[in-house]
Amino acid sequence: MSGSCVRLRSVLLALVLILPGASIAQDAPPPGDEALAASIVQKADLVRFPAEGFEMTVTINTTTADGPADTRKYRVLSKGNENTVVMTTEPASERGQILLMKGHDLWMFLPSVSQPVRLPLAQRLTGAVANGDLARANFAGDYTAQLLRTEKIDGEATYVLELTAVDRTVTYHRVLYWVRQANFWPQKAEFYSLSERLLKTCLYQKFEKMAGRVRPMRLTMLDALRADEESTLEYADMRMRDLPDKIFTKDYLKRLE
């Protein structure tokens, strides 16, 4: 009798191990696993942008229900997710304006002003785009991540994470972040204010190979406070560059073209 029980238990165990549902349950991430959540955000950061030095151009188009589209273009130099230079190239009336980010510190340099102006990352740059959306993309360094759940978007299994700001210098107080499980591609983000008000939703789109791996080359920002306003960021000409640290200094900016 006991031998039969042992054999039955062995058969049941084998069935559990090979059932698809059991495999999914084993692979399902435990909610609240901080180490796993941090790893997911780090990997998604590397999908969005290289960790090494790189250059790219960004075109931002903003549309509203009652006005013509506004188009602005920028040249971006970035290194290590902590140092960024953003140069305005269009419109011509703003050409020569430069943003310099070092860590969480951001300055704007204007051709007509001798001293740089300190700016917050959360301040609006244009349309639904904040300074930090363009100058800083270091979610892993700016937020503490918690894995909330998994769900599907367009049939793709995704992690759903809650990102909480490490301090008040970062662009947003809280972010809900959807990342595809199969390849850590970011899918969507919702950005919230300190008062927990939804500010905007970002959709990561147009995945193409650029600078060594497949990345989202278009971001669509949907303004939650201005329902008729939408901004798209189109990335182009992304390439790796050896950028010396001296580029990311106030004294060097006048030499940039």
Which residues fall in each region the model found?
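A short, amphipathic edge element
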Residues: 38-39, 136-147, 196-201
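Solvent-exposed coil/turn segments that connect beta secondary-structure elements
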Residues: 61, 79-81, 89-91, 104, ...
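Gly/Pro-enriched, hydrophobic low-complexity segments
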Residues: 115-118, 138, 156-251
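N-terminal mature ectodomain segment of secretory-pathway/periplasmic proteins
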Residues: 32, 37-112
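Bacterial N-terminal signal peptides that target proteins for export
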Residues: 1-12
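Acidic/charged, solvent-exposed loop-and-adjacent secondary-structure segments enriched in E/D, K/R, S/T
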Residues: 110-136
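Boundary at the C-terminal end of the N-terminal hydrophobic targeting segment
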Residues: 23-27
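Bacterial N-terminal signal peptides
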Residues: 10-21
